[in-house]
A protein has these predicted regions:
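Catalytic strand-loop segment that frames the active site of acyl-thioester-processing enzymes
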Residues: 1-46, 50
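HotDog/MaoC-like acyl-thioester-processing domains
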Residues: 1-16, 72, 77-78, 88-151
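Glycine-rich, flexible loop/turn motifs
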Residues: 21-23, 27, 59-61, 117, ...
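Short, electropositive, low-hydrophobicity segments enriched in small/polar residues
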Residues: 32-36, 56, 130
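Residue-level recognition of specific faces of alpha-helices
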Residues: 36-39, 64, 117
Length: 151
């Protein structure tokens, strides 16, 4: 099976350090794939909060994660501090993409690259809704273009 084609961005808008807990380990003794997705969620919530938003109120709309792509590059263990860098781009009529780079600052190890597709959602109406202008503006700003680094 071919690997997901995810490349790092040239610039990320936000970073947060998170600690790998014992409960984040799988039977192999390293960070489990399900737990990585949970840590990405933590990073996403912190990124949104840094812009004054939340998943329930992102510039006036709710957010739902429509898809996720993870590409593992290395293992992480209990006690490791991981750096989650978050970028934003690819604005669409009803959504956008978030990009993540996960590294271990202690030794510079690459742990993962990931993307999540976020869908704007009106919980009152129970349907997708248009991307708010402030989010679109951030997606298209000079640092939020989603421009990829060279392969």
């Amino acid at each position: 099976m071919p690997r997901a084609d995810i490349r790092a961005l040239r610039h990320y808008l936000f970073m947060v350090d998170l600690k790998v807990r014992i409960t984040d380990l799988n039977y192999g003794g390293h960070l489990g794939n399900d737990r990585l997705l949970g840590l990405l969620h933590e990073a996403r919530v912190a990124f949104l909060a840094s812009n004054g938003w939340s998943e329930m109120n992102c510039a006036g709309v709710g957010l739902i994660m429509g898809d996720a792509v993870l590409r593992y590059q290395g293992q992480a263990y209990a006690g490791d501090i991981l750096r989650f860098e978050v970028g934003i781009g690819e604005p669409r009529r009803c959504g956008f993409r978030l990009y993540y780079r996960v590294t271990r600052p202690a030794d510079g190890a690459a742990i993962a690259l990931a993307e999540t597709g976020m869908v704007c959602f009106d919980y009152r109406e129970g349907k997708m809704c248009p991307l708010p202008a402030p989010v679109k503006d951030l997606c298209t700003s000079s640092l939020g273009t989603g421009e990829r680094a060279d392969p």
